[in-house]
Amino acid sequence: MNTDDLILHSRARFDHVAAKRILREKYEARMIFAHAGGMWRAGPELINILATVPPGDAVLLDLYETPVQVRPEELRSMAMTRWQEQMNAWLIEHNELSTKR
């Protein structure tokens, strides 16, 4: 490999890493949603917390550490739906990005 090929390869690698980072930031931002007067981030942590909370009303801290009274079943359903939708979309875009390399 000559120097020009190495430079092209390193630029392509850098562009791919940057594109993956941007893709991650894009979908992490899409995981945020509002419910019951609070802001929540859909993800395994929230889903697991909600799975362990007993049925009925509960008070949880939202993203801004504000106590919010929620119905755990509703919030868990919304979080799981948002998580699955965004993870599926992220996977599709990630696979498209990987084929462009």
Where are these regions (language model features)?
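A preference for well-ordered globular domain cores
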Residues: 1-101
